[in-house]
């Protein structure tokens, strides 16, 4: 038995598997990576409170990928499972410019999948000192990217180092009176051919902080509190077509000794 564990440990420690295409996302932010033509990826994200977000992404050509996802809360556990929405969310990625030695890749995209549960909450709006009305807020705990553009550049520095920066605008989760343009950036550092370190920051400028000053009932919805979201992760290429990722999210917001943890499993294949 000890020999079996030793063999497994050595295999895991020294396995060197290259993934056939660059990362499509970091922990959550999009990159300029797309799927090769004739390739699909099935992704499963396991989130807090037994949540699960399965996603299917297909490469129509080397620069154009489309996909859809569907969020479920309480999928694991004893509570009744509930879907975030009745219809699936969509993803579209189109890389306009390829990366060169001197210039980054440039991609435009659309992603309607937010993070966490989908919140539908009636909150009071103070019209004047004597009257108020109810407004229904409809948004994810962390808003979807919506329309976005992203630049990605890679360097070979004792393994690949990729840097990604982008802007996004969510035009459909705006009932919190905040449709500001948002900024995000991050990096991925290859530790060896099997393991990569991920680090990212979502400024969450569109998180509804201006509206929060007007509405007392919006406190638990504006989860960013104006600080944005800092996330980190470790990605393991178990095989050429299989990735597992352990992520630590919102580490700048959590006052506890432990972070919000997620597991992401990605399987890719040709068709």
What is each residue range found by the language model?
Residues 2-13:
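Sec-dependent N-terminal signal peptides
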Residues 16-163, 167-172, 188-271:
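Transmembrane beta-barrel domains of Gram-negative outer membranes and organellar outer membranes
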């Amino acid at each position: 038995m000890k020999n079996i564990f030793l063999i497994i440990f050595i295999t895991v420690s020294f396995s060197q598997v290259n993934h056939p295409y660059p990362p499509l996302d970091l922990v959550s932010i999009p990159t300029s990576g797309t799927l090769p033509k004739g390739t699909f990826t099935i992704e499963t994200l396991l989130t807090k409170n037994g949540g699960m977000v399965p996603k299917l992404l297909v490469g129509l050509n080397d620069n154009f990928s489309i996909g859809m996802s569907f969020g479920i809360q309480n999928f694991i556990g004893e509570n009744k499972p509930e879907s975030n929405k009745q219809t699936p969310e969509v993803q579209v990625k189109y890389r306009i410019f390829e990366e060169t030695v001197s210039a980054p890749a440039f991609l435009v995209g659309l992603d309607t999948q937010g993070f966490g549960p989908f919140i539908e909450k009636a909150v009071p709006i103070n019209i004047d000192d004597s009257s108020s009305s109810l407004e229904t807020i409809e948004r994810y705990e962390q808003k979807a990217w919506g329309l976005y553009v992203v630049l990605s550049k890679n360097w070979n520095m004792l393994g690949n180092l990729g840097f990604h920066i982008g802007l996004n605008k969510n035009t459909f989760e705006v009932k919190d009176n905040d449709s500001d343009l948002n900024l995000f950036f991050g990096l991925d550092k290859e530790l060896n051919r099997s393991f990569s370190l991920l680090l990212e920051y979502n400024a969450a400028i569109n998180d509804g902080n201006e509206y929060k000053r007007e509405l007392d009932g919006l406190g638990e919805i504006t989860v960013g509190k104006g600080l944005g979201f800092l996330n980190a992760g470790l990605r393991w290429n178990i095989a050429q077509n299989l990735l597992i990722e352990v992520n630590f999210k919102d580490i700048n917001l959590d006052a506890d000794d432990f972070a919000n943890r997620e597991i992401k499993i990605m399987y890719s294949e040709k068709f």
